[in-house]
UniProtKB/Swiss-Prot annotation:
HEAT repeats by residue range: 230-269, 524-562, 586-624, 630-667
Native organism: Rattus norvegicus (Rat)
Phosphoserine modification, residue list: S471, S474, S714
Chain spans, region Disordered: 365-417
SUPFAM superfamilies (UniProt xref): ARM repeat (SSF48371)
Comp. bias (Basic residues): 384-396
Entries under Gene3D superfamilies matching the protein: Leucine-rich Repeat Variant
Keywords (A to Z) from UniProt: Phosphoprotein, Repeat
Protein name, UniProt field: HEAT repeat-containing protein 6
Amino acid sequence: MSALPGSKLSERVRTVGWQISRPYFCHFFPIRITAPPATCSANKGFPELEHARPCPKRCPGSISQAIHVGKMAAVQVAASLPCEQPREAPRELSLEQNNGFRRLSARLRALQPDDSTVSRMEIHLLFDQLISENYCEGGGVAPEDVSALLVRACQLVPLNQNHLVSKVSQLIHRLLNRLQVIVDEQNLDFLLTYTISAIQQCSPWTHMEILQALAALVYCNGSKCQKHLPDLLGKSGLLMKLSDVTHSDPEVRRAAVHCMANLCLSVPGQPYLEESYQLVCFQAFLTILQSPKSSDMDDITFCMLLQNALKGIQSLLNGGKMRLTQTEHLGALLAVLKKAMFHGLPGLNIEMPAVLYPTPLPQYDGRSPVKPQQPESSAARPSANKKKKYKVKPKKTQQGEKAEEEEPYGEVDAAPGLSMDQANTCVESAWCSSPWGSQGLPVDGGRATGREQVSSPFTISSWKRVSSSESDYSDAEGGMQGKMRSYQAKVRQGALACFLSTIKSIEKKVLYGYWSAFVPDTPELGSPQSVSLMTLTLKDPSPKTRACALQVLSAILEGSKQFLSVAEDTSDHKRAFTPFSVTIASSIRELHRCLLLALVAESSSQTLTQIIKCLANLVSNAPYNRLKLSLLTKVWNHIKPYIRHKDVNVRVSSLTLLGAVVSTHAPLPEVQLLLQQPCSSGRSSSSATPHLSTPDGWKALPAGPSLEEASLSSPKGTAEPCWLIRLCISTVVLPKEDSCSGSDAGSALGSTYEPSPMRLEALQVLAHLARGYFSMAQLYLMELGEVICKCMCEANPSIQLHGVKLLEELGTGLIQQYKPDSSTAPEQRVPVHMVAMFWTAMLNGPLPRALQSTEHPTLQASACDALSSILPEAFSSLPNDKQILCITMLLGLNDSKNHLVKAATSRALGVYVLFPCLRQDVIFVADTANAILMSLQDKSLNVRAKAAWSLGNLTDTLIVNMDTPDPSFQDEFSGLLLLKMLQSAIQASTDKDKVKSNAVRALGNLLHFLQPSHIERPRFAEIIEESIQALISTVVNEAAMKVRWNACYAMGNVFKNPALPLGTAPWTSQAYKALTSVVMSCKNFKVRIRSAAALSVPGRRAQYGSLEQFSQIWSALVTALQRSEDTTDFLEFKYCASLRTHVCQALLHLLGLASASDLPCIQETLTVNGDMIRSYILQFLKSGAGGDDPGAVHSPQERNQMVRVALRHIHSVQALAGDTAKGAIVGFLEDILTVHCDSSGERAVLRGSLDQ
């Protein structure tokens, strides 16, 4: 006790007011014996212990003592000293702890409230024993027992006993923290009332311990504290006063902020803080982050204060689902987050405005001048081609340095598993862009990767952690420096974690307004580059912080394709101003440059993985088809060495990046060339990752006889067509090499192949190549077939699944080659006989077994999808037994109980029914129809949607078969089955839009297919009426536009059946009324177009019904022509010309069918709107519709012929006596032809036509 100031000790003795013997001194004076801080898992949610967060190597039995004198009573639980790794405790330990807890708890319960000296002495003793017990999470102590003990302890301690209140607060904090107990609501109410009263009544020196107890009580209990929130967070609430910037004690202020942060933690399924209290806490946290460090606060306390405020905001955004709807709130938060991101970063101190505003241009972020730091800034700059060795003394196990390598802050899971030795012995460095001065590469600091320097044209400068023996500081000062750096890094990590939560809580379109504040841009000549996330990635000495920054950047880039699509720099910019598209393109280029610099400079495998993932996100979203070449080439050449990295996560992410390259805007000519390059690494100097400098470095696949005979590979002796395909094949099927097996955590013990993630990623890259660059993949068709067979033979379902997906992509690529509009020349296609050979090998292999793998329904479904990707021409070339096998398997799987399998089977049957070799097989079509009708009754919407699509395909087959010369199919197809199909389609037309769109399509085809023999049967009459009513209601109702388009198309199909009583049936007027309503007023022009096309289908005047009906149709079409440009949606304007074309075609079609009684109504409309109609018909004759409109007449001769046919028909009509309408209409048409032929130089042709 000699170390204690005598005056203060005497003051404390006077405060206690009695004399005590030495053995009981520690129970009355504030000498507290505390157990060590909790482990990482136990400390969760208690950041006040973060400066003393122990590593797993700390002994659970170590005890630290802290003597509280005067204000020292506010000091936190002291950090325990590191010691040897503890041995595993015996299994009886938890029972022993439980017994000790029960024994002490029983003694405490036996005590009665008493103000005597002996009673206080006994309570002190019991509290000390309870605090010093060696608890561990899950130690057999029931939570309700802990809560009951704490309630009893508080009942025994009156609030006028400051020392006992301090001790019971320590007990609450210790037990709840160590045993991870969440207090139940009833006991929580009592304990909160007690602690709130204690803060109000006890001496200020006790507030620190009381606030720690309060933080432990409210942790994950915010929803149960509603009645106490006014006392805590009200205008004069305790936490608001104690956390105010004007509060005199910085430690108490920090503890109060920690309590607020814990209050903001939410528990899923429970109510959260009211919005008003959320806003109060948010504003308090924001004020703390905006306020500078006060003079009476030390740096570490300030760092912990910032951490707690950041954690509080993160909790509000994550669990509370707080929405930053006000621009001021979001801008203020982003401003403080950007400042906190760089807190304590060596050599950098930025000044930020109070609020950031959305703007496409970089905003001011001035830098305060900083003094050169020693010894970092005084380090010598080694040259680029010479390594300099640094002596690195093993550091003492300082508490602050340990904390740097602890769990990541918040949600950011960066650099997991980084060992302490790696962190303490590394020499940190990074390349930085030229505006920062110098650029550095990492120097070998004993990392496992053993990275050497890479030659670079940039000047090199290294940042490093200098051991205390090399610095001007003493060992103690060096330890404090390391501790300070650790806490500053934690603030930066906390800010990045909070920023990540902010990104997830706001819309991307809002976030991209702040793009320039966080994403780098190419600096103007002579101006410094603004600080950004890449500044942290390149300059932060902490690998964990670098990884956090990369994770935030990845979140920003994810889903940014639409935003980045405006970028363009394909031409040199020479304008007086910089367009936004050029600015975004410049930002994309700078991101590529900085990320590639970071890739070269990084020595931590975990951070390296984050860099590559971030690059993959950038590559997936950047519009390379609008950017100058070489960006992808640089990414490609930089990433190739990392494919052979020792760390499996780096290798997997490297393949992911290559997959992103080959899938972005495929096919790109630049990537096509890269795929054909030799397989060198693209580097001239050595690096930390082993790479291949020659093609011999790649694994070689032995070519079997079957491959030599069947493969389309280039002849022997020529260059490898695609090294990436060769790499992926070898990764999937060949045993791994020793050079890559050292750190393959996650690979199966004794496995001879690459780890599963690596093989799965290789299969995905092959699938991307097959989808985007099939011309290269087809060279390996048979070889890839062997890879697929090998994958499907493996026990790992994931490998099997990805093998089957690759098969589907290959099949789809083969189908695309043979489509009529394919750009692949016939001689460059894979021959049909080879495609048949490929599929025969698949069907002779494990594919049937995958189809029958009932224990893996996802695999079964994918196998069905693969089976549906057989080229139709190749299917007919398969042996009969293989064709029967495919059909039998699919029809059998349609009875599956699993909805995934059933949906895939229904779709596959819908594909097969279109095959030319199967569509005329009445038995197959009937079996398929029955299977589809059964699936239409399934409970799963997905199954019904696939079945409806297949039903539409099947009815398309019926229509195709109508055009064949042989009528046997129509005669043999069952009328009863046709009736069932109509009934099912009617029922499906009332289903969800996904089902309805194909159901109405099927209805139209079925009504078109009906033969006179069907229509004459009484049982069909009613079903025909119901079917047409279903179509009419779908046309008129406000359904999805695709559904209405299909319904109009179906009505047109119905009108094509001459056997139906169109014109005389009662439903005729309803059908025409629905179509004319749509053609005049539907918001979607594509639906209007389809309606106009349907109105021009009937081929006889009688099918249009009465004179009144014909007049209504004619008037509706004229009105549609008038309104063809009336739209508020600018996206519809591109369909205006097509709409006018179809309406003009319909009007001319009606003129070609009009009877004498129809002519007066036509003349009437021509009198009023003749000029408008004439101008649009002339425009139609001149240009027609665009070439992309399949329903329009494209030939000028055909368009002229339509007018001439109409004119000839009107001439032939026998006009009624005294009727002038015929002459007027003839004159109108002749005038149109005259004007058109004058403009096109066809006057002679016109005269011959008129003479006829």
